[in-house]
Amino acid sequence: MAKQTKKQQEVAKLDPEKLYTVDEAIAVLREHKAKFDETVEVAMNLGVDPRHADQMVRGMVSLPSGTGKTVKVAVFAKGDNAEKATAAGADKVGAEDLMEDMQNGNLDYDRVIATPDMMGVVGRLGKVLGPKGLMPNPKLGTVTPNVEQAVKDAKGGQVEFRVEKMGIIHSGIGKMSFKDEDLKANFKSFTDAIVKAKPSGAKGKYVKKVSLTSSMGPGLKIDLAEVEGA
């Protein structure tokens, strides 16, 4: 049996059933931080079955303190909209040329945005973008005439959330280098958005469990009293 590191031994001493406030959880994660700037992540177990359309939880939320990571954005637009997207900081802007580029496997993007008139072109990329969760969607604000704002939102800390098979939803909400108050503000914005996105088909208790963790740190259960409306 492999010998446990000192850090693993310290983590093993933590009570896995203890409920923490967000302040306490951040403090514990800082006590067990790694030598690199870890991502801080929140995970929520929801009382939904996403196999049913009326129990899907999906949307966008802007984190007030940003995510701490560089977001690569591609935009399908022409003319004036293309110029606005470029000025807003898009990493790649194009039309048919961008479609061909993506068909050739160049998909190193975190967000793909399109103007409505470009959906005829983007539609041909369904099999390429769909499996990666990158297909522009009007409900998520990624098909929009206002590409300038969409690019700024993507670059400025807007994250997409989508519930997974077992009713779990998770997202990075910042880095360990963030101040406590910035992590707390992002935690609140994210959990508020999930509570607000409660689907019509959800039955029984909606928010079952919330935990906070870091890239290499322990998973800490958060007291549901910390989540407004849970």
UniProtKB/Swiss-Prot annotation:
GO CC terms, sorted: cytosolic large ribosomal subunit
GO biological process, one term: translation
GO MF annotations, alphabetized: rRNA binding; structural constituent of ribosome; tRNA binding
UniProt keyword Nucleotide-binding present: no
Keyword field: Repressor, Ribonucleoprotein, Ribosomal protein, RNA-binding, rRNA-binding, Translation regulation, tRNA-binding
Source domain of life: Bacteria
CDD domains documented for this protein: Ribosomal_L1
The keyword Ribosomal protein appears for this protein: yes
Classification via SUPFAM superfamilies: Ribosomal protein L1
One Pfam family here: Ribosomal_L1
Listed HAMAP family: Ribosomal_uL1_B
Family of the protein in this entry: Belongs to the universal ribosomal protein uL1 family.
Subunit architecture: Part of the 50S ribosomal subunit.
Function field: Binds directly to 23S rRNA. The L1 stalk is quite mobile in the ribosome, and is involved in E site tRNA release.
Full protein name: Large ribosomal subunit protein uL1
Classification of source organism: Bacteria, Pseudomonadati, Pseudomonadota, Alphaproteobacteria, Sphingomonadales
